[in-house]
Amino acid sequence: MEQKIDLERCTLTVCEIARRAGAYIREERSKFSLESVERKHAHDYVSYVDKGSERLIVSALRELLPEAGFITEEGTADIEGTTDFEGTTDLDGTGVRGCGGARNDCGRSNLVPPYPRTPAPPLLWVVDPLDGTTNFIHQYAPYAVSIALLQGREVLIGVVYEICADECFYAWKGVGAFVSRSEQRGMTSERLHVSSQKIQDALLCLQLPYNSDAYKPTIKRLIDTFYGNVGSIRMCGSAAMALCYVAAGRLDGYAEQYIGQWDYMAGSLIVMETGGTVTDYSGSSDFTQGNSVIATNGIIQQDLLTVVKSA
């Protein structure tokens, strides 16, 4: 039986949690040194700040929904006594796939489970405690906290807090998506809307994974096709923020492959709740188990899909 949750109350509480984590990250950045950076894989970094932020978030989310499990990027939830299904997961309630098996060229877990699957809880938090770690290290905006709540394959809540601009993007299923900001007169909130740009005037974000060898044919085809034929192309270094920028109409489309569920899950709901379109690279709207995302205003979705399918 599906569990009934007060999604509005839960979402606003998650916004507060994300802001607290963001305040921690902002404070630690003022005293951060490169000596504290670790390499997970080639060009893929993690710091004590990622792990500290994740512990803060997991602790608060456990209090909010004690029955929920976790998919987290840094794998701290299991250390603190809560099952952490780090890595690629089945989201149909039947089980969770481990991350201890073979890696693809970009370091992400393959979709084939290396071990027998274990039962998954009906509710899962998907957490990226610091999306855009390389940006953070270099003091280059944006970087963000990303938190999503799943029930089966359905994304119920998405919250992304951009630390440098102090903007919290959020959505809960069926209501729309919003952004809140702290201003002199207090906290303000406004509804988000995707753009209405067509492909010839579109501003696209084409992200490169940290190890892009396997992605070179696709990104080359994307750039060769669209460079000079769209408004412009950008890279921003944060999947969560690229999705939020699409939702806010600041970008018209975004495409990336070889990314984790924590990178895109929250932002994808935010895009969809504004009327945008999100699929994987095959064009499937059942993108929650994959490692590729295309998100657009809906108008240019087929333009991007046609190119990635032919790469």
Label each PLM-derived region with a short phrase:
Residues L192-A311:
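An extended, acidic
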